[in-house]
């Protein structure tokens, strides 16, 4: 008998499994949970999502014998409809694909990029211009990234993948709790944006939609139908492209028809890092943060953590101090990275991957001492924002992890009236030469705006594989600059501290990104440890309401899969027995 636990929520991270029996997903759920989320335990595969219709979208592809990539694409399209505050075809993505049969990973970089007319000083020192309105829009990459993945690994027809999202958009759906929250937080902006107001307000009251109100995205549904029929090029070169460009121009944007036509995703090698226990970590290269994650975990690996490392207050304080100091060194490197197609970041990558540098970094961490930011090599850090995440582990052992985003809530705050597409504000992820931080430290030149360049990202969708070639863990997160620290802390807890995937995700988190020089801590983090960290010299502040959210799949020693979503936003799990 099948069992499913579901809760609507903010799209963060999805786990898609490949096994169903006669269309029914089977699941065993661990009892006595410590949080509202459920850890599903499956013999072969799992599905977990915070958006019920979108988990169904992925499963419908699997029932039709689709590939893991097919399921991921269908789910991405669905969440772009269902959770417009965080994702959609007006944005971009990073995808890691692992082929079990050949034991090879690959990365598809479909990050948004700067238009040809973009310049370093286009915002004239006005931060608002980079985060709202037409100038904040970068060239979207999501659909061509999907198309490349489908061309290489898809089994079902392209048009088939769009059907669940099209139905959802045209028939409508109840506003979930997290979309409702985003609408409340952005109420003033929604009411003052004619293009968003047309979809997300009640025509009778004139106020924003509330939870369980029905939202219908007819125009977007029509656009998806055209792309389903004509292929991704419809968005980049067809009538949809023409309509989109006209709307962007009316918003004061500078993206041209040539910008759209010329956009291409980039097929890349995955980052590779070897950890103790004969594990290999595959993640995403610049402009994303896979090398930063690998650096963090390789340094931490040298401390030989175990369950005893958090067995009491003293040991736990030391462990978290070492973790925080490692983050500081890592985030200093992050500010030096940029789009490797344009910036020469080879020397930075060489340092991040050097065994000698890893060992020296470990040696520089002093157990009873912390320093000011410049000690770690601080430069101005950029902040990125909202994202959504998808992970797939198939029956065949293939894996796909994807991070997708339109950046801040509702992106640029602009919806194309002709197409229904909500447009990103990814230009805000670049550094600007005429904006310094509060420390007077200049911004990183490696992330300055250049036409055709892709901005830095904190995302690090990751796959861990054992020496036999089997996927051990597929993991990722949302939450801007907190993504890398959250994925590293959760991975550390699973790999070395004896936690299962649910315990690792549930436990309260710490974050440090070097600038500002303070620990962000969740409210449930033990106060005794915080006090001891402060005694060492760490500054602390409570984390805000919108931290990072992690979801992961972990394969146990016997081959059983365990999957969990982050209780901080809710979700669902399904799988096969």
Swiss-Prot record:
Keyword check for Nucleotide-binding: no
**Signal peptide extent:** 1-25
The taxonomy runs:
Eukaryota, Metazoa, Ecdysozoa, Arthropoda, Myriapoda
Quaternary structure and interacting proteins, as annotated: Heterodimer composed of subunits alpha and beta; probably disulfide-linked.
Tissue specificity as recorded in UniProt: Expressed by the venom gland.
Molecular function GO labels: glutathione hydrolase activity; toxin activity
NCBIfam families cross-referenced by the UniProt entry: g_glut_trans
Q: Name one GO cellular component term.
A: extracellular region
Q: Which GO terms describe its biological process?
A: glutathione catabolic process; killing of cells of another organism
Q: Does this UniProt record's set of keywords contain Magnesium?
A: no
> Keywords in UniProt for this one?
Cytolysis, Disulfide bond, Hemolysis, Hemostasis impairing toxin, Platelet aggregation activating toxin, Secreted, Signal, Toxin
This molecule's function is given as:
Dose-dependently induces human platelet aggregation on both plasma rich platelet and washed platelet (max. response at 3.2 ug/mL) and causes hemolysis against mouse and rabbit erythrocytes (35 and 65% respectively at 5 ug/mL). Does not show hemolytic activity against human erythrocytes (even at 100 ug/mL).
**Pfam families found in the cross-reference section:** G_glu_transpept
Localization per record = Secreted
Spell out the protein name for this chain. Scoloptoxin SSD14
Cross-referenced Gene3D superfamilies: 1.10.246.130, 3.60.20.40
